[in-house]
Amino acid sequence: MAATCEISNVFSNYFNAMYSSEDPTLAPAPPTTFGTEDLVLTLNNQQMTLEGPGPQTRSQRDRTDPLAVLHLAEKASWTSERPQFWSKTQVLEWISYQVEKNKYDASSIDFSRCDMDGATLCSCALEELRLVFGPLGDQLHAQLRDLTSNSSDELSWIIELLEKDGMSFQESLGDSGPFDQGSPFAQELLDDGRQASPYYCSTYGPGAPSPGSSDVSTARTATPQSSHASDSGGSDVDLDLTESKVFPRDGFPDYKKGEPKHGKRKRGRPRKLSKEYWDCLEGKKSKHAPRGTHLWEFIRDILIHPELNEGLMKWENRHEGVFKFLRSEAVAQLWGQKKKNSNMTYEKLSRAMRYYYKREILERVDGRRLVYKFGKNSSGWKEEEVGESRN
């Protein structure tokens, strides 16, 4: 009941703000005891006011003007935040805006299921949104996809090239179910046999460990301790398998707005690489393949392929294995795309990197921000090793 009251208050405030300028009779006051049915009735009354019957006055036409709806959106608090960080109130405001923008019949919306924050909303699949919002679910899903992946177009071409270099990750280990366990609609859609959420994080599959990672199989079986791994950061395996435990949805770090972009790629596809280059990649795989399966290998492969670097990272001292992140959030998003995790941030990625300190695969460079060093148990980054793998 408390959730329904909160939903009703948000929708009431929304329509009061939109309809109170000229004629207060156009916005009927909600009843004292406001339930889900009353909320649907109020929204339907608003649409009857907008759409008829009878000719519209000038003031009514102004209220359906797209410019008026846009002006209302500019005043909403959700426009200044990423969807993953929206509060429950901001989610309801955004839903209200979409209902008004699309002139949608609100009677088909199941408002009892709208009590969720932005992280939960972003974890919903298209089928889940259709269950709650009916045909409007397609529009909401498309809008969320645009808002949460505004930088994916810029980086997706790098993923394609990395995967052509033999760095595609293994098949999922088993079938743990199509939805994140935090989704409020997972069980219902599991019963219906629906498809998996596009925001669900894939798990690691079996594969031969690369050099320097002989005890990865031990880490895979150590998931019961993963909830206590926040101090040491946990492995990249822990990050994917138990992210909802290590990083709860209501604990996202503040996103740094206005982070400067370095070396942004011009529009269009990158230049075509020579046939000899692709023959080298496809015909003569490195002895360290499969590559890029683990986080430290992913970082290494970006560094040893300047044609893929695109201003993301640079060598500070190649001989000593010292490197620096130039666009830390962009690298984190690349890793998130590779692991099907749309909520990846540099803070989470750096925590996972700490896992390699104890194994002496990576080292911290004291006193220098965003600077790290490959340890004695790492491999494949030295110039002589790279030369051997390409011969």
Swiss-Prot record:
Residues 293-375 bind DNA. Residues 242-261 have a biased composition (Basic and acidic residues). Disruption phenotype: Mice show about 30% fetal lethality at around 11.5 dpc. Approximately 70% of the mutant progeny are born and display severe alterations in tissue architecture in the small intestine. Elf3-deficient enterocytes express markedly reduced levels of TGFBR2. Residues 262-271 have a biased composition (Basic residues). Residues 211-229 have a biased composition (Polar residues). CDD domains: SAM_PNT-ESE-1-like. PROSITE patterns: ETS_DOMAIN_3, PNT. Induction: Expression in HC11 cells from midpregnant mouse mammary epithelium increases upon reaching lactogenic competency, and is down-regulated upon exposure to lactogenic hormones that induce milk protein (Beta-casein) expression. Up-regulated upon differentiation in corneal epithelium. Expressed in small intestine, colon, lung, kidney and uterus. Also expressed in the corneal epithelium and conjunctiva of the developing and adult eye. Not detected in liver, spleen, thymus, brain, heart, skeletal muscle or ovary. The keyword DNA-binding applies. PANTHER family: ETS, ETS-RELATED TRANSCRIPTION FACTOR ELF-3. Belongs to the ETS family. One of its GO terms (cellular component) is cytosol. Transcriptional activator that binds and transactivates ETS sequences containing the consensus nucleotide core sequence GGA[AT]. Acts synergistically with POU2F3 to transactivate the SPRR2A promoter and with RUNX1 to transactivate the ANGPT1 promoter. Also transactivates collagenase, CCL20, CLND7, FLG, KRT8, NOS2, PTGS2, SPRR2B, TGFBR2 and TGM3 promoters. Represses KRT4 promoter activity. Involved in mediating vascular inflammation. May play an important role in epithelial cell differentiation and tumorigenesis. May be a critical downstream effector of the ERBB2 signaling pathway. Disulfide bonds: none annotated. Residues 65-151 form the PNT domain. This is ETS-related transcription factor Elf-3. GO terms for biological process: anatomical structure morphogenesis; blastocyst development; cell differentiation; extracellular matrix organization; inflammatory response; mammary gland involution; negative regulation of DNA-templated transcription; positive regulation of transcription by RNA polymerase II. Residues 200-271 are annotated as: Disordered. SMART domains: ETS, SAM_PNT. Pfam families: Ets, SAM_PNT. The keyword Protein transport does not apply. Its main location: cytoplasm. Interacts with TBP. Interacts with CREBBP and EP300; these act as transcriptional coactivators of ELF3 and positively modulate its function. Interacts with XRCC5/KU86 and XRCC6/KU70; these inhibit the ability of ELF3 to bind DNA and negatively modulate its transcriptional activity. Associated with CLND7 and POU2F3. Interacts with ZNF768. It is found in: Cytoplasm; Nucleus.
